[in-house]
C-alpha cells in the first residue's frame, strides 16, 4: 500500500512540475530555426486561426509570399471580412516584412495595409513558429503583452499549401505547436470555398 501511495504522489509532483515549467511568456516561444524566406515563398491557405481583438479576415484566407532580389519579403493576401455586422466582402491586403535581428530570421515585423480605405493598416510582429515549407506553417503575432510577459491580444494562423487540409501526422505536429504557444483549443477552422 505504501508503494502505491508513493507512486501516486510522485506522479502528482511530476505533473505539477511540468505545468510550472511550461511558461506562456511570449519571449520563451521558439521559432523556426534557420528560417529560409525563399523556401517559404509561394501560396499558402489558412486552415485554422485564432483571431485578435477587432476586425480580422473571416474565411477564404490565402497569402502569396514573394522574396525580392534584395531579400525583402512581401505578401498579398485575400480573405472575406464582415463589415458593419452584415456586409461580407473579399478584402485584399498587402504586407512588407523586416527582420529586426538577423540571428532569428523567423521573427519578423510586418507592416500591412488594406487595399481599400475601410480596411485597417498597421504593424505587428510576425513569427514563423514552425514550417516544413512544403505542407504547413504556423504563424504567430502578439499585439500586446500582460505584465507577466504572456500575450494579452494576439493571433495565429495555421497555413497549408493545400486548401483541402493536412495529413494526420502533420496535424499532430500542429497541435503540439499550438500547445507550445499557449493557444491550444483557441483555434477556429477557416472555410476554403474559393469565394475569394
Swiss-Prot record:
Its main location: secreted. Residues 1-21 form the signal peptide. May be involved in the transport of retinol between the photoreceptors and the pigmented epithelium. It is found in: Secreted, Extracellular space, Extracellular matrix, Interphotoreceptor matrix. Disulfide bonds join 24-182, 90-196, 142-151. This is Purpurin. Keywords: Disulfide bond, Extracellular matrix, Retinol-binding, Secreted, Signal, Transport, Vitamin A. GO terms for cellular component: extracellular space; interphotoreceptor matrix. GO terms for molecular function: retinal binding; retinol binding; retinol transmembrane transporter activity. InterPro entries: Calycin, Lipocalin_ApoD, Lipocalin_CS, Lipocln_cytosolic_FA-bd_dom, Retinol-bd/Purpurin. Belongs to the calycin superfamily. Lipocalin family.
Amino acid at each position: 500500500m505504501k508503494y502505491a501511495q508513493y507512486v501516486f504522489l510522485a506522479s502528482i509532483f511530476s505533473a505539477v512540475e511540468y505545468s510550472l515549467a511550461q511558461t506562456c511568456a511570449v519571449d520563451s516561444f521558439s521559432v523556426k530555426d534557420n528560417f529560409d524566406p525563399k523556401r517559404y515563398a509561394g501560396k499558402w491557405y489558412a486552415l485554422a486561426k485564432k483571431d485578435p481583438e477587432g476586425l480580422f479576415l473571416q474565411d477564404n484566407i490565402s497569402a502569396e509570399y514573394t522574396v525580392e532580389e534584395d531579400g525583402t519579403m512581401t505578401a498579398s493576401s485575400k480573405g472575406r471580412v464582415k463589415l458593419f455586422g452584415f456586409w461580407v466582402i473579399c478584402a485584399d491586403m498587402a504586407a512588407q516584412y523586416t527582420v529586426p535581428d538577423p540571428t532569428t530570421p523567423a521573427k519578423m515585423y510586418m507592416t500591412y495595409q488594406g487595399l481599400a480605405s475601410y480596411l485597417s493598416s498597421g504593424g505587428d510582429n510576425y513569427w514563423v513558429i514552425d514550417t516544413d515549407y512544403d505542407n504547413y506553417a504556423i504563424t504567430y503575432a502578439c499585439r500586446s503583452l500582460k505584465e507577466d510577459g504572456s500575450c494579452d491580444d494576439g493571433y495565429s494562423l495555421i497555413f497549408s499549401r493545400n486548401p483541402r487540409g493536412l495529413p494526420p501526422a502533420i496535424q499532430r505536429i500542429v497541435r503540439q505547436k499550438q500547445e507550445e504557444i499557449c493557444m491550444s483549443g483557441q483555434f477556429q477552422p477557416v472555410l476554403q470555398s474559393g469565394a475569394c
